[in-house]
Amino acid sequence: MHLREASEGPTRRGGDLSSIGRKKADCPICRRGRPRDVVAVLRSAWVSAPSRAALPGYVAVVAKRHVVEPFELPASSGFAFWRDVLLVAKALADLFSPVKMNYEIHGNTIPHLHVHLYPRFHADPFVGRPIDSREASFTRSKAERTRISRAIRRATAGSRSTRTVHR
């Protein structure tokens, strides 16, 4: 099995679910020290906004602590992680005004807890079907990534979540 983290999101080649390593040493995010394309650093998570995405506003909220499943987080860390996910979702909703926000957790491609946030729109290319991240047809500009970073900063200003970055 070959694990990698592509700029447009997590992907896996070959193997099956039984071959996914759950250990921190098997995790490409942990080996690198953080995910790629980070636009915000929060108390319990990083927010990744790759330059190519399936939909405008897509981000992944990636837990700083290495776990594969949400239930593996201690209670206080779990609450902090979900608070960060909800703050980011609200920031995206305020910025993009979607008709719906989709929350997806898989973990069968990269063994590290991360939540995909997809703002959904009336005329998006996935109406009536699941989002396929391999159909990354939206390319966002540096300005778009900066807008996302600033929206998250505003949303987290009054919380215990810490800082926002843009690279």
Which sequence ranges carry the predicted segments?
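HIT superfamily nucleotide-processing domains
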Residues: 2-5, 9-167
